[in-house]
Amino acid sequence: MLFRSTADQGEKVMKNLVFNNNGARALGECALVPDPSPISQSGITFFNTLFDENASNHLAIGAAYATSVEGGADMTEEELKAAGLNRSDVHVDFMIGSNQMNIDGIHHDGSRVPIFRNGDWVI
């Protein structure tokens, strides 16, 4: 749950988005996209989320995609909520990836499993 937000630019817009839209304070998506993806390697920022989100790891606040759970496309809003999907009128992606990003999975016993190294899949 997002409780505070700051920004070097556009902070007022960000706060309005987060605190004035139901469900916008919760995570809606977490996507791992390898840096060597074709969109990333093009070096172009398209200023179109549907393209740009395929260039980088990203997190989204707001609505989760119904299709991220089996049968989700046929579920009611109540069923989606019961399945744990965040519901909101907004879904905003924030790109966070780079060719220097390392990501580990952590087991219950604390041991780590490398997932991403230098912006690319290990497993």
PLM regions and their residue ranges:
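A short, polar/charged loop-to-alpha-helix boundary motif
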Residues: 11-21
